[in-house]
Amino acid sequence: AASSEAASETETAELSTVEPGKLIMSTNAAFPPYEMTTDSGEFEGIDIETAQAIADKLGLELQIDDMDFDAALLAVQQGKADMVMAGVTVTDERQNVMDFTDSYATGIQSIIVKEDSDIASVDDLAGKKIGTQRGTTGYLYCSDDFGDENVVAYDNGLTAVQMLNNGQVDCVVIDNAPAKEFIAANPG
């Protein structure tokens, strides 16, 4: 999780938030199992439960603002959200503009392909059309290693997987945990 302010238990009484009485969390709720929406439009997932526990401990009402990943990061930087929880990987660039908690998950990048794909490893990605989620480390790695011309950035991982299913990209590079969720939901 990244936040605009850090507070220890002893500093809780002095914690200032964007809106008094609320803890505003920005997220991109299309990143299972960390954050997603149910069929009824409710937010759920590991990050949602963690944010609720933080809000409860601080005696605040949790407000979740769902937006594109890049916008979720910017919301904290612009003072529109108190924290972002959206599977955010710690990078030097991000540490220059926001504070991070201790890591509570380790994200490794995975490649999602169709069953009949000729892509068997990262070595096979050269010259392929790679789908990613805009602004993520998967996007950054693929753009750096395979060139912007080979990377298509989508607003969220779900859209990237839909484009793979429709044949518009050859693969999707995304964190391992959501990759498993997307594969389970999209056989073939």
Predicted regions and their residues:
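Acidic, polar ligand-binding/catalytic clefts
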Residues: 52, 61-124
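A ligand-binding cleft/hinge motif common to bilobed small-molecule-binding domains
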Residues: 71, 88-96, 141-144, 170-188
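Short helix-initiation/N-cap motifs at beta->coil->alpha
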Residues: 48, 64-75, 117, 152-166
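Extracytoplasmic small-molecule ligand-binding "clamshell" domains
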Residues: 11-87
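Alpha-to-beta junction loops
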Residues: 60-61, 77-86, 128-129, 156, ...
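Bacterial lipoprotein signal-peptidase II cleavage site
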Residues: 1-9
